[in-house]
Each structure stands twice: as C-alpha cells, then as structure tokens.
Amino acid sequence: MGNQQVVSITGAGSGIGLELVRSFKSAGYYVSALVRNEEQEALLCKEFKDALEIVVGDVRDHATNEKLIKQTIDRFGHLDCFIANAGIWDYMLSIEEPWEKISSSFDEIFDINVKSYFSGISAALPELKKTNGSVVMTASVSSHAVGGGGSCYIASKHAVLGMVKALAYELAPEVRVNAVSPGGTVTSLCGPASAGFDKMHMKDMPGIDDMIKGLTPLGFAAKPEDVVAPYLLLASRKQGKFITGTVISIDGGMALGRK
C-alpha cells in the first residue's frame, strides 16, 4: 500500500468514532474500524462502500482486538496509529444506588473505558513498533473535572490519564502515546447494560443541549465533527512527531467551570 498512512479505530460505528473515520479518510488514511454490531457495519458500508476494513465485535474481547489488527495488516500491510475510542457513559449513576447495581456498572464501565484500551494497545503494539507509530486515546472533560458524569464514569476517565502518562514513558522512543479530552459534545453514547442503560443515548436525553450550553463558557453544545481535529494532529508523523504523554482538551472551556 506504499507510504499511505494506516489508522485503526475502535468505537467507530457512531459518535466521535464515526466522525474520526470520516476525517481520517478525508485526510488520505487507510482506515480499519471496530464496530459493535451489524447495524453499524451496514452504516459504514453504505457510506464508504468497501474502502474500510471493518470488524464487528466486542471491544472487551482481546481476540476481537487481535482480529482487528490482523485484518488491518492483511489488507493494508502496516499500522501507523491506533485510536482507542470505544466508551460508555454512566448516566450520572450515584454511589447511593444499591451496591449490586454500582458493582456491575463499575465493572462494565471499566472493562470498556479502560481495559479495552489496554487490550487494543497490546494487540496493536507489535505493529506500531515496526513503524514507530502512535496511540491516541479518547479521554474526556471528566478526566479533569467533575460534573460530566457519575463517579464510575469520572473514575474511568481519570484512569485514562494515568495510562497515557505511563505508556508514553514506557514506550518512548518507539511509540508515541497521547489522548484527546472531548467535552460538551452531544453523541449517541450509551450506558452500561448492567444498569439498564444500554438502549439509552445521550443525544436523546431531554434538555441535553441546554444543559451543556449552561456548563460551557463558549455557550454551545459541540457535535462530533467539532472535536476530531486534535486526533489528526496527534496521529500526524509531521505535526505530531514531538508530542507524547500529552492530553489535548477540546471542551468549549467546560473544565474551567461555569461562566
């Protein structure tokens, strides 16, 4: 496939992940995508025809992450960037809920928001070392401040910050590791099935736009296409070559507090 850059993206079937697929394709990358179900696969196939390498599966399953990387290499020959983007929200789950609900939700949220990132990076790492590639993770405004979710979600996103720092240090100089912290963004993010939130979508919550506007100094709720530019910067071998261990916030100033 020559010198064309190759990126692999998890959580690619909706929201920020889907917009990442669009943006990286527009930037000339070859793209492989991990999606959750056949419905998301069909959506990508309709928009991109056969231009993507698509894997359907559970991001929590290490074999699925290994399959994503194998199929990426089989089709495109190499891997330049792995984007760990899959995630779920906790719909402001309170510590005052029954322990069984908290415990099962915590496990599911951390399995997807944290452990799946480790799994995907582990699967991608041998190929990234060959190309001196990079990792970009999706953190959150909730990695830096409270108010963007319940305590389970906020704890999971704080964990991502630790991963970025530890892995950037461990993997330098061969592989760069960074993250983007979106906030104030309306997406179709769902919640843990263990709490009955798997059929819910953030974008369908009544008043969500107005709530975000009230929390954001810039005064509007972002769309996924508004927050993808930092990923392209961090993935770039030219513009991002001296960046590692860095988290770029793109949250309309939400982490600063209310205006």
Curated annotation (Swiss-Prot):
<protein>
    <recommendedName>
        <fullName>1,2-dihydroxy-1,2-dihydronaphthalene dehydrogenase</fullName>
        <ecNumber>1.3.1.29</ecNumber>
        <ecNumber>1.3.1.60</ecNumber>
    </recommendedName>
</protein>
<comment type="function">
    <text>Catalyzes the oxidation of naphthalene dihydrodiol into 1,2-dihydroxynaphthalene.</text>
</comment>
<keyword id="KW-0614">Plasmid</keyword>
<keyword id="KW-0058">Aromatic hydrocarbons catabolism</keyword>
<comment type="similarity">
    <text>Belongs to the short-chain dehydrogenases/reductases (SDR) family.</text>
</comment>
<feature type="binding site">
    <location>
        <position position="140"/>
    </location>
    <ligand>
        <name>substrate</name>
    </ligand>
</feature>
<dbReference type="InterPro" id="IPR047950">
    <property type="entry name" value="BphB-like_SDR"/>
</dbReference>
<keyword id="KW-0520">NAD</keyword>
<dbReference type="GO" id="GO:0009056">
    <property type="term" value="P:catabolic process"/>
</dbReference>
<dbReference type="GO" id="GO:0018505">
    <property type="term" value="F:cis-1,2-dihydro-1,2-dihydroxynaphthalene dehydrogenase activity"/>
</dbReference>
<dbReference type="GO" id="GO:0018513">
    <property type="term" value="F:dibenzothiophene dihydrodiol dehydrogenase activity"/>
</dbReference>
<dbReference type="InterPro" id="IPR036291">
    <property type="entry name" value="NAD(P)-bd_dom_sf"/>
</dbReference>
<dbReference type="Pfam" id="PF13561">
    <property type="entry name" value="adh_short_C2"/>
</dbReference>
<keyword id="KW-0560">Oxidoreductase</keyword>
<comment type="pathway">
    <text>Aromatic compound metabolism; naphthalene degradation.</text>
</comment>
<feature type="active site" description="Proton acceptor">
    <location>
        <position position="153"/>
    </location>
</feature>
<dbReference type="GO" id="GO:0050664">
    <property type="term" value="F:oxidoreductase activity, acting on NAD(P)H, oxygen as acceptor"/>
</dbReference>
<feature type="binding site">
    <location>
        <begin position="8"/>
        <end position="32"/>
    </location>
    <ligand>
        <name>NAD(+)</name>
    </ligand>
</feature>
<dbReference type="InterPro" id="IPR002347">
    <property type="entry name" value="SDR_fam"/>
</dbReference>
